[in-house]
Structure formats: C-alpha cells, structure tokens
C-alpha cells in the first residue's frame, strides 16, 4: 500500500513541471487491479517506485489469496470473488525499466537510490541505455509485456517506440499507457480562434493509425480499446492515453443489451433503458 513513509521517501523524485503527481497513483491502481506478470517502463522518474510498490503488493496479495484458497474456509468472503485458474501458476512478475539517464531535467538518476531505500530494488532490472533496438535481446518471461508505461521524449520517440514494441505487447488484453498526448493552449486556425484542446506531442488518433499501419504491413489485425484522460486545469503534461490490446473484437449485435444478456444465458428480466 502507499503508506506515509512511502510517500515521504518518493517526494524528492517529484518534479512539478513533469505532471505525474496524479499519474503515479493511477499507475499504482491499474497495476494492482490488472496484476501483470511482465511490466515495462520506459523513462524513469517519480512513477517508478509506484509501479514497483504495486508489484510488491501484488506478490503479497497473490500469496495471501493462495493461502486462503488452500485453507478453503467456507465462510471466507474473499473466496467468492477469486478465479481459481489464476492461482495455478506461480506469480513471479518481471519488471524492466529503461532509461539512458541523460536528461538533466528529470529525476531519473535519483530513482535507483530511492528504490533501494524502499527495499524495492530486487523487483526490477534497469537497462541503462536507449529503448531502441532492445527487443531482439528480450525473451520470455520478460516478453510479451502485460503492462507498458511509456513516458520518454517527443513525437519521434513515440513513433519509434510503437514501431518496435507494439508486436511485443500481450495481444490478449495487454495494456499500454502513454503520457502527455494532449495539451491545452490557444490555437489559431485560418486566422480564427480554434479549439483550446489541441493535440500534444502525438495525438492519440495518429498513434492508432500508426499501430494499424504496422499491423497491416505484417498481415495482422490491430484490435484495441482506447481511453484518454485529460487534466482540464493544465496547459501541458496533463494527459494519459490508455490502449488495451484485444485478440478478438466481439461482433456488434443487432439487439439491445438486455436481449444480448438473455441470449447469453444470463437470467432476466433486465431493466430497459434509453439514451
């Protein structure tokens, strides 16, 4: 959990100009919820210890859940929500962090020291160098990645990253989060004031088209879900885009939600609703 001692320890890594004060906690929660077995972070900083703490908490929770399953106490409410199949494999997650530690405007060089002080250094491997052309050296269980957090550079880095790494993200629900995909600034279009919400370093729609182009070149389908979270009170460094890979896309039905549920064997009746 994110204790007061943890927050005090990571405080020196916080840079107000990099906009990750809310992102760090968001990453912690998503990793706790999805319990990835392979995690990649490109771009060290304030978020790194949050990711590692989430993984440590996942390991402890998995072990406790397994003990509960083995005891099998009939009045244990936790057992009502656990999927037994998820506990047939050991949970020994891998975390790979990549940074060349060359950006003096970040706190990346301080991250290893803080992580060691928190006792989290055994949970990750640090590759000090470029993320480019790294994937040929990666083998299971490091790949495919269940969870990727990319916060590094500008448009060129985003394109290079997607080109190399998209095929190595788990196709069955692998999650990719990218930082700073929008900004809020005045714009001028055809000499008239434009929308205050404008694309950031790489607009999400451009990223998605790039993914589809890459998959098309390989003869593969690119299926995914997308959500972007924008902080309306910031001019920059205030957005995150989440892309979740899908192995298959469910077909769109011609009936309403209630009918689909009933057709799928879920008992009705269901309340009807309209938009």
Residue ranges of predicted features:
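Class I SAM-dependent methyltransferase Rossmann-like catalytic core
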Residues: 2-35, 49-53
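S-adenosylmethionine/decaboxylated-SAM
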Residues: 33, 37-275
